[in-house]
Amino acid sequence: MTTLAIDIGGTKLAAALIDNNLRISQRRELPTPASKTPDALREALKALVEPLRAEARQVAIASTGIIQEGMLLALNPHNLGGLLHFPLVQTLETIAGLPTLAVNDAQAAAWAEYHALPDDIRDMVFITVSTGVGGGVVCDGKLLTGKGGLAGHLGHTLADPHGPVCGCGRVGCVEAIASGRGMAAAARDDLAGCDAKTLFIRAGEGHQQARHLVSQSAQVIARMIADVKAITDCQCVVIGGSVGLAEGYLEQVRAFLMQEPEPYHVALSAARYRHDAGLLGAALLAQGDTL
């Protein structure tokens, strides 16, 4: 059965047709509407899926935020703008005229990456470091979503009790420091106003402050992974996201993790499906994989 998979992120929307063998075809992308209003997102989704819907039999959505009963919610409302309580499933069912499933994008990506691992891996954690920091947890071969959809929101664990205020309302969350947005917010002087991509470029050029911001992000993520290992005793951690997959970043995270006591060490790897993980994981779930 062909699935129309959609990935809704903070900066871009992606859609593709995915068959039962996880082959991706007709992949399309559009920028996420800058206004982040319900009408703008609805029109963008319509434009994105219209050329694809005739060949699909169902829709699977991987979206930023928390999905509760088909509605879009968020720990950090700033990530959604005016889209809080957006009726995601109902909107796509109306646009596509097809049965629709929606799941958090990091949870979906975790499920895809889990399927790419050897059969003897039953416990894994996926972490995405991008505009925000998210995650997904697979325990004994089952994806944890939680009754309220909150499971895996690792970016809202504590990194620094004296750190910046996070958009979720807590002080010193991992996301507020280690995410692309957090790094950009901390940039000063000649780096003020730079986005994360620019910070990585400047770090590669040897800019001291940029190198510090990237290193600080990697250290915060490494410490979070040590916490995750203590909580889940996972067999491996897979890292994705635009920051997580940036050149040299995973190596820095690995080096910082090795500074933690040995019981907190865990195998790290880059996401195999990279930026398609959310699409593939949502399709897998829609095609019959159970949570």
Swiss-Prot record:
**Organism domain of life:** Bacteria
Supply the Pfam families for this chain: ROK
Q: Which GO terms describe its biological process?
A: N-acetylneuraminate catabolic process
PROSITE patterns, alphabetized = ROK
UniProt keyword Transmembrane present:
no
Keywords carried by this UniProt record: ATP-binding, Carbohydrate metabolism, Kinase, Metal-binding, Nucleotide-binding, Transferase, Zinc
Catalyzes what? an N-acyl-D-mannosamine + ATP = an N-acyl-D-mannosamine 6-phosphate + ADP + H(+)
* Protein residues bound to Zn(2+): H156, C166, C168, C173
For the protein in the UniProt heading, the enzyme class is transferase
User: Could you say which residues bind ATP here?
Assistant: 5-12, 132-139
InterPro entries to which the protein is assigned, alphabetical = ATPase_NBD, ManNAc_kinase_bac, ROK, ROK_cs
Can the keyword Cytoplasm be found in this entry's annotation? no
* Recorded metabolic or biological pathway in which this protein acts: Amino-sugar metabolism; N-acetylneuraminate degradation; D-fructose 6-phosphate from N-acetylneuraminate: step 2/5
Q: What is its EC number?
A: 2.7.1.60
One MF term from GO for this chain? Answer: N-acylmannosamine kinase activity
User: What protein family does this chain belong to?
Assistant: Belongs to the ROK (NagC/XylR) family. NanK subfamily.
Subunit description: Homodimer.
Q: What does this protein do?
A: Catalyzes the phosphorylation of N-acetylmannosamine (ManNAc) to ManNAc-6-P.
Protein's name according to its UniProt entry: N-acetylmannosamine kinase
**Organism field:** Salmonella typhi
Gene designation per UniProt: nanK
